């Protein structure tokens, strides 16, 4: 395992995940009966400040269909949490106008790359074009100097 699991912190993330899903209208409990489901949700809401008990609630009441999705969410959150500790692994964000994002996303999709890889490739292409233009300009000046000496 690359990233250390921190039980209290991750239990808090799980609690927030489940509450968010409940507020979005998803069924977070394994119960079909509305009163049993609401009872379990009320119990979950009361556990906000007791992260260790959240795991017990999950084992007892959580909808099995949410298990893998929650694991993926927590894994991604753990990765972001630990990557944020170091400048070189910390994610940066930029604001793009929608049309710019749309064109960039289309280009990335056509190239089969991520947005970040596409941006790096575009920067490298621009740098190479600039180097080529400078080299051609230098060759042109040298050629003119040679022809001018005759």
Curated annotation (Swiss-Prot):
Subcellular location: Cytoplasm
Gene3D superfamilies: MatP, N-terminal domain (1.20.1270.380), Met repressor-like (1.10.1220.10)
Pfam family, one: MatP
Keywords for the protein's UniProt record, in alphabetical order: Cell cycle, Cell division, Cytoplasm, DNA-binding
Domain of life: Bacteria
tRNA processing is among the record's keywords: no
A Gene Ontology molecular function term of the record: sequence-specific DNA binding
GO CC, alphabetical: cytoplasm
GO BP terms: cell division; regulation of DNA-templated transcription
Family of the protein in this entry: Belongs to the MatP family.
Primary role: Required for spatial organization of the terminus region of the chromosome (Ter macrodomain) during the cell cycle. Prevents early segregation of duplicated Ter macrodomains during cell division. Binds specifically to matS, which is a 13 bp signature motif repeated within the Ter macrodomain.
Known partners and oligomeric status: Homodimer.
Protein name: Macrodomain Ter protein
Organism: Escherichia coli O1:K1 / APEC
Gene it is expressed from: matP
């Amino acid at each position: 395992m690359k990233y250390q699991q921190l039980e209290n912190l991750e239990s808090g993330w799980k609690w927030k995940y489940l509450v968010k899903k409940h507020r979005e209208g998803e069924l977070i409990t394994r119960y079909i009966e509305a009163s049993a489901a609401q009872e379990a949700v009320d119990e979950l809401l009361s556990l906000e400040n007791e992260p260790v008990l959240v795991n017990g609630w999950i084992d007892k009441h959580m909808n099995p269909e949410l298990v893998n999705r929650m694991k993926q969410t927590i894994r991604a959150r753990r990765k972001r949490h630990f990557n944020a500790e170091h400048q070189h692994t910390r994610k940066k964000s930029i604001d793009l106008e929608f049309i710019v994002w749309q064109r960039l996303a289309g280009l990335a999709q056509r190239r089969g790359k991520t947005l970040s890889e596409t941006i790096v490739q575009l920067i490298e292409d621009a740098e190479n074009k600039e180097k080529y233009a400078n080299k051609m300009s230098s060759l042109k000046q040298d050629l003119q100097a040679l022809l001018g000496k005759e």
